[in-house]
Amino acid sequence: MAGRGKGKTAGKKAVSRSSKAGLQFPVGRIARYLKKGKYAERIGAGAPVYLAAVLEYLTAEVLELAGNAARDNKKNRIVPRHIQLAIRNDEELGKLLGDVTIASGGVLPNIHAVLLPKKSKGGKGEEAA
């Protein structure tokens, strides 16, 4: 029957672009956002896959470091404070997210060296005359 087109075969199940790429982040949704956002007139097929992979990697990195910060503080739940500590203590993430403010993140503990008590030079039992 000519002119019918390809059509979907009855037995085939739809496979998402995320699962094809081995990603958890939604490639289709990111593609839709890229098109809707008018970032460019046309969006290549690989662009949303690449962007989803980058976002997934950065998210996994931040969550791993924040989980370590939560464990260091003997907590089971990651809160914004742990995310703040994770980002600010990591050199590369700190540079990437330097201008970002995290709500309820607090500040890094830091005491200026001038304000710290001076260490005495003499050892035990020695007194200056």
Swiss-Prot record:
Position of the signal peptide: none
Species the sequence originates in: Volvox carteri (Green alga)
Stored CDD domains: HFD_H2A
PANTHER family, alphabetized: HISTONE H2A
Assembly with partners or alone: The nucleosome is a histone octamer containing two molecules each of H2A, H2B, H3 and H4 assembled in one H3-H4 heterotetramer and two H2A-H2B heterodimers. The octamer wraps approximately 147 bp of DNA.
Compartments, as annotated in UniProt: Nucleus; Chromosome
Protein name: Histone H2A-IV
Family: Belongs to the histone H2A family.
